[in-house]
Amino acid sequence: MYRHPALVPLSHEHQRLLFVCRYLKKDAAAYEGFPLETQAKLAYIVKVFQEVMVPHIQKEEYLFESCAGKDAELDALIQELTAEHQQISRMYSALTENTDLEDAMDQLARSLEEHIRKEERLLFELLQQKQAGWLDRISWEN
């Protein structure tokens, strides 16, 4: 699937986050070097959210704000994705308070996976179709 160069870094982050989703699910296969204990998984997700997810969401919010008001279809999708960002953030924040941590991580993983796939299949395609000129002007700082 073609990705505009401005979207490639976000897609790479999505790939890393999709691995995290697979790892956090209840039915996760064993991955070499990744423990299956619930507390170890929690420590891993905390690290990944701080290092990858927070800056990733900031980049996407920049995209959302910059594209707002230019296309009704894009606006509706952005509104939906923004609500999902908020829900995923709430799910992450509530992990330590949850009585069934394994189930909470599984739900977070499944929600995040669905969200990422929506961004890749819908948002990025719409941006490439309707905002290609704007995407040409984006340069991400690492």
Task: Put a short name on every predicted segment.
Residues 1-142:
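Small-residue-biased structural context
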